Every structure is written in structure tokens, then in C-alpha cells.
Regions:
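Bacterial N-terminal signal peptides that target proteins for export
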Residues: 1-10
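Bacterial N-terminal signal peptides
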Residues: 10-18
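Sec-dependent signal peptide cleavage junction
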Residues: 18-26
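Acidic/histidine-rich, surface-exposed loop or edge segments in extracytoplasmic proteins
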Residues: 29-30, 92-101, 122-127, 169-170, ...
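N-terminal targeting signals for Sec/Tat export/insertion, comprising classic cleavable signal peptides
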Residues: 31-60
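Signal peptide-directed extracytoplasmic domains
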Residues: 69-125
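Soluble oligomerization/assembly scaffold segments of membrane-associated complexes
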Residues: 119, 124-219, 224, 231
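Charged, long alpha-helical assembly modules
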Residues: 219-293
Length: 293
């Protein structure tokens, strides 16, 4: 009996080890997610952008149906289209490394938009490259990142978090068309930073808070955009607010640096314009003086 019991314990332990091994992943592990509607030449071009040979990294496929699972109803159907084109190369990084995102030939989703949406969805510590064989919105890439990350880790991300991440991506993108991508990202990050306050506020009070935040960034938002932001806020409140706030710090620093750089460029351009205007004015006065003599 003792022998049988010992064998049972050993077998159970082996099963546990096998199960944990099946879901173990390590730093440096990677996946490539390819849009299902690419032909062989386009796939070759994508791998060239990624700087790797096809077959070196495990590959998965993303379909338009996969994309619609998260984005349908959130964005104009034209943005989603009926084909999956954008592609992703994701590599797991050391704990605490954060998210690195780079894009190429993506004309709607920005790197910061992806980063924010992925953080909301629960993806951290990864290097993500997004590209396509020609210019596309890049919405399909979010689904590709989700699928690739889950394939690497062997664990499913929260369905709610993935849906909210997708909604955040779309709301940010739509807002960016009117007020600029940096401003849209910063505004939503500010909103995420006060979720512990907004969750106890009425819709009317949250709307007032959104208007205040918009004023801080010197941007105007319409009533429709405020409604969108309110809806996103209520969805974000359903997630782990403390985790979101912790992840927000590094992202906010990145956005602030981008906005500071933009301000410096704007001030430099203004200074140059003023100097050129002043110079031309001086030249004009000089010649005017010559002709008046």
C-alpha cells in the first residue's frame, strides 16, 4: 500500500510539473502574427521589415473575423475593412522592462495608442513591432498582439481587459483626429489616473471633470466626444484600478516628453519665423530708405 501511495504521489508531482512546463515561457521568446490576407510576396516584405527569416520564429495567423471580435461596433467599418493586413512581431522582455512599441506604414494607430491599449489589456514587458506591406490603419495589429502574447504565455488575457483595451485604442484614435495624438493620449491617461475618484462620481460630474482636463491641455472636445470618454471611463473602472495607475507612470512620462519636444519645436519655429520676419522688415526698410533719398 505504501509503495502504491508513493507511486501515486510521484505521478501527481510529475503531472503538475508537466502542466506548469506547458505554460512556462522565457525572456526572449517571440511570435510573429501575420494578416491572413497577405500573399507570399507581401509576407516576405513584412519579414524583411522585421529583420528576420520566415520560419525562425513561430508564426500565427490573424483573420478579419478575429479583428471584428474586439472592434466591431467601436469604429467605422471602413477602418476595420474586410481583410487582415497588419502584422506583428512580439518578443518577451525581462520583468520591469516595460513596453517598447514601434510601427512602420501604419497610418492611424500610433505607437503610444498601442502601448496604452496593451497596458490596459494586461500586456507588459514586451518588444512589439507592427508593420504592413502597404499603408493601413493598423487596427488588426491589436488583435495580433493579443493572440501572439497568449500563444507565448499559454494563458488567456482577461476578455474584459482586451475589450476595454480595444475600446481605448479606438476612442484615442478618433479623438486624435480632432485634437492631436499626443493630446488625446495625455487626456485619456489623465482620466485613467483619477479612476478611483470617478468611480464614485455621477455621470454629470465625470463629464465636468473631462471638460476640466481638456481645458488643462487647451483642447476643445465635443459633447459626443465627452460621451465617448465617459463610456470608456466607466469601462476602465471595471478593471483593477490600482494596477492601471501603477502602469500609467512610465507611459505618462513618455507622453509628457513627446509633448515637451513638440512644444520646443513649436517655439523654435515661432522664434525662427519672428527672426525671418524681422530680417525681411529690416531689408524692406533699408531699400525703402535708398529709394527715398
Amino acid at each position: 500500500m505504501k509503495c502504491k501511495r508513493l507511486i501515486s504521489i510521484i505521478m501527481a508531482a510529475l503531472c503538475l510539473l508537466t502542466m506548469s512546463g506547458a505554460f512556462a515561457y522565457k525572456v526572449g521568446e517571440a511570435r510573429v502574427a501575420i494578416g491572413a490576407n497577405l500573399d507570399s510576396e507581401q509576407i516576405a516584405a513584412v519579414y524583411s521589415d522585421f529583420g528576420i527569416e520566415r520560419g525562425v520564429i513561430p508564426e500565427i495567423t490573424v483573420t478579419n473575423e478575429n479583428e471584428r471580435q474586439y472592434l466591431e461596433g467601436l469604429v467605422d467599418d471602413k477602418k476595420i475593412g474586410h481583410k487582415a493586413i497588419s502584422c506583428v512581431y512580439i518578443t518577451i522582455l525581462d520583468d520591469g522592462s516595460g513596453l517598447n512599441v514601434s510601427t512602420k506604414i501604419i497610418n492611424w494607430c500610433t505607437e503610444q495608442m498601442y502601448k496604452n491599449a496593451l497596458t490596459t489589456a494586461g500586456i507588459t514587458d514586451a518588444d512589439v513591432k507592427v508593420t504592413a506591406p502597404f499603408e493601413v490603419s493598423g487596427t488588426a495589429a491589436l488583435t495580433g498582439i493579443y493572440k501572439a502574447y497568449e500563444d507565448i504565455t499559454g494563458n488567456s488575457l482577461s476578455s474584459l481587459a482586451k475589450m476595454v483595451g480595444a475600446e481605448e485604442l479606438i476612442v484615442t484614435g478618433q479623438l486624435a483626429e480632432y485634437i492631436g495624438s499626443d493630446e488625446a493620449t495625455a487626456l485619456i491617461n489623465e482620466l485613467k489616473g483619477i479612476l478611483d475618484i470617478t468611480e464614485t462620481m455621477s455621470d454629470a460630474d465625470v463629464k465636468k471633470e473631462i471638460k476640466k482636463l481638456a481645458d488643462q491641455y487647451n483642447v476643445q472636445v465635443t459633447d459626443e466626444q465627452i460621451e465617448q470618454l465617459l463610456k470608456l471611463c466607466r469601462q476602465l473602472e471595471k478593471l483593477d484600478i490600482n494596477q492601471l495607475k501603477e502602469k500609467l507612470v512610465s507611459i505618462t512620462n513618455t507622453v509628457e516628453k513627446a509633448m515637451t519636444a513638440k512644444d520646443k519645436v513649436a517655439k523654435t519655429v515661432t522664434t525662427i519665423t519672428e527672426k525671418v520676419t524681422g530680417f525681411l522688415g529690416s531689408v524692406s526698410k533699408f531699400f525703402a530708405g535708398l529709394f527715398n533719398k
